[in-house]
């Protein structure tokens, strides 16, 4: 295994771990995720908060695939994979999901605690934590609402997704979840 591959694996696991650690230590009632690469500006978070507290949904999920993106924001292969997973998740979860891997998500802490308590149901192999949260939210009967954002070019860091390696892993997770949700 190359050093670059090892570092990418550490970063992915670290991202998932840091989100979980932050959520565990949070003292407020509302939990928010915003990726550090600033592809979504922090100024968008009040829209997510408003959608949650107004009761529009229980789990507010960012969507990068509605508005035109800046030129370098997402590679074509990633865009195609995102659209595939969106269709698969919409069918699988029985509610429309337009973007499964947007890092911007907002939910109630009490709902997250229920998701975390039942995480074992889908396994603990999600390298980024997005599928884990979406599967858990659907399993807990939460209303997932997509909220479009304007996706920008990365201003910090590099992508942590290795499209083929992680794409295959995410596909395996979706198939596993399909057996747990649709064919129980």
How would you label these PLM feature ranges?
Residues 1-8:
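Acidic donor-binding segment of Leloir-type glycosyltransferases
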Residues 9-25, 30, 42-123, 127, ...:
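Acceptor/aglycone-binding surface of glycosyltransferases and processive sugar-polymer synthases
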Residues 38-40:
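Acidic metal-phosphate-binding loop of nucleotide-sugar-dependent transferases
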Residues 122-123, 134-151:
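Catalytic donor-sugar/metal-binding loop of nucleotide-sugar-dependent glycosyltransferases
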Residues 129-131:
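DNA-recognition element of transcription regulators
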Residues 172-184:
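C-terminal, non-catalytic tails of nucleotide-sugar-dependent glycosyltransferases
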């Amino acid at each position: 295994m190359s050093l670059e591959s090892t570092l990418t694996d550490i970063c992915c696991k670290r991202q998932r771990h840091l989100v979980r650690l932050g959520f565990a230590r949070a003292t407020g009632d509302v939990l928010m995720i915003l990726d550090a690469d600033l592809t979504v500006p922090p100024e968008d978070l009040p829209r997510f908060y408003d959608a949650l507290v107004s009761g529009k949904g229980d789990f507010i999920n960012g969507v990068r695939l509605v508005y035109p993106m800046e030129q370098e924001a997402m590679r074509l292969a990633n865009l195609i994979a995102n659209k595939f997973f969106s269709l698969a998740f919409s069918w699988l979860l029985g509610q429309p999901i337009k973007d499964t891997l947007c890092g911007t998500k907002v939910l109630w802490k009490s709902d997250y605690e229920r998701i975390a308590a039942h995480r074992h149901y889908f396994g603990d192999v999600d390298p980024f934590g997005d599928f884990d949260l979406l599967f858990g939210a659907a399993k807990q009967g939460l209303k997932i609402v997509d909220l479009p954002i304007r996706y920008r070019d990365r201003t910090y860091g590099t992508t942590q997704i290795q499209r083929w390696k992680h794409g295959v892993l995410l596909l395996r997770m979706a198939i596993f979840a399909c057996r747990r949700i649709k064919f129980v």
